[in-house]
Amino acid sequence: MVVCEKNVLLLLFAKRKMDRFMWTNGLLEMNETLVIQQRGVRLYDGEDKAKLDVGGVVLSTHRLLWRDQKNHECCICIPLSQVIFFEEQAAGIGKSAKIVIHLHPAPENKEPGPYQHSKYSYIKLSFKEHGQIEFYRRLTEEMTQKRWENTPVSQPIPTGTGPKAGRTRAVGIVGIERKLEEKRKETDKNISEAFEDLSKLMEKAKEMVELSRSIANKIKDKQGDITEDETIRFKSYLLSMGIANPVTRETHGSGTQYHIQLAKQLGDMLQAPLEERGGMMALTEVYCLVNRARGMELLSPEDLVNACKIFESLKLPLRLRVFDSGVMVVQLQSHSEEEMIASALDNVSDKGSLTAEEFAKLLGLSVLLAKERLLLAEKMGHLCRDDSVEGLRFYPNLF
Amino acid sequence: MSFEWPWQYNFPPFFTLQPNVDTRQKQLAAWCSLVLSYCRHRKLYTLDVLEAQESPVFNNKKIERKLSVEAIQVVFEELRKKGNLEWLDKNKSRCLIMWRRPEEWGKLIYQWVSKNGMVNSVFTLYELANGDDTEKEEFHGLEDWMLLRSLQALQTDGKAEIITMDDGKGVKFF
């Protein structure tokens, strides 16, 4: 019965075929799961009605199957991997809603199916008894998840190797259409990937850094080809981005030209602000001040620290100082610590006792620096502390 | 007679354990002498740590400051090192306060004994600590354990001998 029908089909419909389909016994393989099925579906080869009757369509994790409603033994299937993309076609007057499925060309080693050749590269499923919305949704899910890739079934199903395989064999307008569609999807996928997950964005950023590093190294190797000017410019771009360029440090030693220039610039720039603030500024304040003034070509924190470290060796009137607590400040060389502590003691004695906040207000310093000064005075034995629920207060050391 | 508090008692930083090492040493010294003089004044011979927290010594309600438990432990440890304190239990919850060391008590007792020409006499412990004759003496009311230790100190010096009698202990002075 089945064989009879097959021959009839082959004879009658030699020209217009849906050649991707294969005969199947309709049973699901191991690892293959049923997703959804819908009766009352007619198959179309491209725009033409397939000469098969109405049947039921079955979607599994691996394949799309169709079984004749009247003759249950007539069952054909197509692997989901053959599907390039699919879309809905709305119902019209006298016409049922359809799902159009674009397919890869049939591979050479495909098993026999109801059609040998087809001039169309797409088929349609016409939902005579509705159910297309749900079916479309599930098909979308399966095509996104691509579960057949994870659990291959034992039956040898020729699988498409992806858009690339399609590309090499595509011809004509259909091929061009397909290429455009694939490109659009690829771009879309990239964009959504990058934005969807910030960690993926970080990875891409890492790749960027790696890329610029490798370029820097290439520059180092090809020193002769690229002009000195360009090399320096490129390096300064990298530095302003905050990417440590090992090349520069190696070739010029510590205290690179860049840092030296920067240190001199800072020396000029910070004089006035430092005097306004009593001779001392936290490094974070310096960073904000300097970058705000620069506008473009901002400094990286690393550069700032490295430039500050060489103040002394360049005989500039500034110093970088690190407190016990780890706080870093830039202070004028003329700034004397003893003076500061003596004046702190006077302030505290005057008022009887002071908290860091009160002291900061009194002197116009930031609270952080005020606290550092009080702690230093305590370390020297000039002050002692009163730690209670009311907060931390400093008293003159009367002990 | 009310107790005279030292100036540190009203100085808020006194109740915060100072991080500066030198300052801390001075602070602890002041605490030790305060604790000892307070105990002497109130004739306290034992202290319970938890109770001590609420005692006026460590808790100055007027300036709203109190010494933390950790700091109290530090003060007690300092006293122990000096020989003025002895823990009664492993958990360090109760201790003996010796604002006068046994040797010093022994000396005082012996002075009284020899001043009154009672060398070579025998006394019961009760007589010494609670007898009418000793009422005006500083060691009057001395707790048994301390009295015993003081007499033991004298014994070591060869100035006394502790005798066991029918209804308790006694001592003979030489």
Swiss-Prot record, chain B:
Its main location: cytoplasm. Keywords: Cytoplasm, Protein transport, Transport. GO terms for biological process: protein transport to vacuole involved in ubiquitin-dependent protein catabolic process via the multivesicular body sorting pathway. SUPFAM superfamilies: Winged helix' DNA-binding domain (SSF46785). GO terms for molecular function: protein homodimerization activity; structural molecule activity. It is found in: Cytoplasm. Pfam families: ESCRT-II. InterPro entries: ESCRT-II_cplx_Vps25-sub, ESCRT-II_cplx_Vps25-sub_N, WH-like_DNA-bd_sf, WH_DNA-bd_sf. One of its GO terms (cellular component) is ESCRT II complex. Component of the endosomal sorting complex required for transport II (ESCRT-II), composed of SNF8, VPS36 and 2 copies of VPS25. Component of the ESCRT-II complex (endosomal sorting complex required for transport II), which is required for multivesicular body (MVB) formation and sorting of endosomal cargo proteins into MVBs. The MVB pathway mediates delivery of transmembrane proteins into the lumen of the lysosome for degradation. The ESCRT-II complex is probably involved in the recruitment of the ESCRT-III complex. This is Vacuolar protein-sorting-associated protein 25. It comes from Danio rerio (Zebrafish). The gene is vps25.
